[in-house]
């Protein structure tokens, strides 16, 4: 049964969040009456208002108005005044993933999960399906540059969504195709143990219907181990691994583009199909891997090589994924969301592939608990940066933890052998260092999930002043 149009006003608490805003936008496009609130004005709130969606700034009981349904994310606390008011009025309170699941019932769906790479892979799947004329509906965890938004309503039969595993609610999503990019020990505050994370991803794949499939990256040992435990669902594997059903090889850089080949082997017939010299306008093996996942999905949906080739070549990227924010004296400045050691290592490796110059990495650790739990990994993930500048921890509402700090991370980086790791107290220290240390052809890469993105956009202007 599809969600009826008669459910009344749907109120989103935290409507400006990247996940919530996309769902609200698609609901509105489908003709539902949508409104919401957020703590602060942001670009997502502005965009929703421009589409005719009422968005309050600040949380208050009276914001609910005539709401009949309230949607919340896991970030909303039980003492939030709108949550309290909804409880008092006995309104249905719906989790973000549950509302996303309701939207997915309108279409056949591809859900992209994994610890890293979800947003980019979701965008790539959408790009290929677009190029193949399938006109998908898309709900993503990041702004897709070609759309200028994280969500769009398509006229086709398919929906492409990012499946956020952070609170376990991704298991509610009724996907026909489930993609897993990788599995690392993240969100242990919710799951309690890595074994429970593994089990959640197994269930994610086994939740697809018998006519669906899992698309899984066997370059990652945890995912390869999971493949052997999937007993009753069809699986297509991908990666650089020689055993992959959809395998990329011969990856190289040409004029800032990744160029690579893809070999597709059918399990039943052992037939082989090769696509040579595919071009992706972004660097990095991890991005080629994500593109291979998208190719695996597109191939399963019957798309031809020409459409795949066209979709990859035209891929416009995702905001905050190695996004160029400006240049100064031949120095390129990038903004990236990477805040986990695996992501940081992949981004810096991609930067190293893309330039023969020096790389200055500017990192803002995100959450004290993450820095504590992955301290050794953070101490070893900056090897591809010539200089590392570490800013104070972005707490994201957490309290400090004794002995866990950016200064401690810098000391650990130096102890592990990094030749130029420094602590910086804030953004005001960056421009003088870049002026002194950087030369034409160098990259400056900002890394983090906090407000460091504002620094990345401010630096080009500061350098020019």
UniProtKB/Swiss-Prot annotation:
Family: Belongs to the MurCDEF family.
Keyword annotations from UniProtKB, A to Z: ATP-binding, Cell cycle, Cell division, Cell shape, Cell wall biogenesis/degradation, Cytoplasm, Ligase, Nucleotide-binding, Peptidoglycan synthesis
GO CC aspect terms: cytoplasm
Main location: cytoplasm
GO MF annotations in UniProt: ATP binding; UDP-N-acetylmuramate-L-alanine ligase activity
Superkingdom of the organism of origin: Bacteria
Binding site for ATP: 114-120
Lineage start: Bacteria, Pseudomonadati, Pseudomonadota, Alphaproteobacteria, Hyphomicrobiales
Localization, UniProt: Cytoplasm
Its biological purpose: Cell wall formation.
InterPro entries noted in UniProt: Mur-like_cat_sf (IPR036565), Mur_ligase_C (IPR004101), Mur_ligase_C_dom_sf (IPR036615), Mur_ligase_cen (IPR013221), Mur_ligase_N (IPR000713), MurCDEF_pg_biosynth (IPR050061), UDP-N-AcMur_Ala_ligase_MurC (IPR005758)
Enzyme class, UniProt record, top EC level: ligase
The organism of origin for this protein: Chelativorans sp. (strain BNC1)
Name recorded for this polypeptide: UDP-N-acetylmuramate--L-alanine ligase
GO biological process: cell division; cell wall organization; peptidoglycan biosynthetic process; regulation of cell shape
Pathway: Cell wall biogenesis; peptidoglycan biosynthesis
HAMAP family in UniProt: MurC
Gene name linked to the record: murC
EC number: 6.3.2.8
Reactions catalysed according to its record: UDP-N-acetyl-alpha-D-muramate + L-alanine + ATP = UDP-N-acetyl-alpha-D-muramoyl-L-alanine + ADP + phosphate + H(+)
